[in-house]
Structures are given as structure tokens and as C-alpha cells.
UniProtKB/Swiss-Prot annotation:
This is Large ribosomal subunit protein uL24. GO terms for biological process: translation. It comes from Blochmanniella floridana. Keywords: Ribonucleoprotein, Ribosomal protein, RNA-binding, rRNA-binding. It comes from the Bacteria. One of its GO terms (cellular component) is ribosome. HAMAP family: Ribosomal_uL24_B. The keyword rRNA-binding applies. Belongs to the universal ribosomal protein uL24 family. GO terms for molecular function: rRNA binding; structural constituent of ribosome. Part of the 50S ribosomal subunit. The keyword Thylakoid does not apply.
Length: 106
């Protein structure tokens, strides 16, 4: 299995949709569905019923929804734009690099 190009806590930029161009940090990554949750991006309103057992009030809450991996790209802070991810073998370990300038992704 190949390594993931986007991982948790990476800074990504949204390529399509209502939040196009916005930058955020990956909070959750679902590999089986190939989707991510990015903090502050793709915020939707959810109508929630009250749950008296858990002392949870009902109402309209805002939460981040999933975005498909194809709609986000890793953000290169050195160039201040979206970039692609490449891999190199260094000291027997596979590391991620930015394709445009070859810098290591932290």
C-alpha cells in the first residue's frame, strides 16, 4: 500500500466548492472513504434533536463536514500556494517532499 500524501495536522488548501481558496488544518482523515475534515472549512448546519438522557439540548448546531481528498491540496508556505506531494527515500525511510521546490514536508 502506498503512503498517504495528505495526513492529519497537514495544512491544506481547498480547490473546489464554496470554500475554494481557504486554508485550514486537517483534523480527521478517513482513508476508507478518502475524505478529510478540515478545521473551519465546509461548515454546515445540523438540526439536532434534544437527548434528555445525555442532557444534550436540541437546536441547530454548526459542524465541519467531510471533503473528498481530491478537492484539497497540501499548502506550501514557502511559495504561499497549493502544491503536489512527492516521495524520496532518505536513510532507508520514505519521506514526503513538495514537488515544486523539493523541500521536506514537516
Amino acid at each position: 500500500m502506498s503512503a498517504n500524501k495528505i495526513r492529519c495536522h497537514d495544512e491544506v488548501v481547498v480547490l473546489t466548492g464554496k470554500d475554494k481558496g481557504k486554508i485550514g488544518r486537517v483534523k480527521f482523515l478517513c482513508l476508507s472513504k478518502k475524505t478529510v475534515i478540515v478545521s473551519g472549512i465546509n461548515v454546515v448546519k445540523k438540526h439536532q434533536k434534544p437527548v434528555p438522557n445525555k442532557n444534550q439540548p436540541g437546536g441547530i448546531i454548526e459542524k465541519e463536514a467531510f471533503i473528498h481528498l481530491s478537492n484539497v491540496a497540501i499548502f506550501n508556505a514557502a511559495l504561499n500556494k497549493a502544491d503536489r506531494v512527492g516521495f524520496k527515500i532518505k536513510n532507508g525511510k520514505k519521506i514526503r517532499i513538495f514537488k515544486s521546490n523539493g523541500n521536506l514536508i514537516k
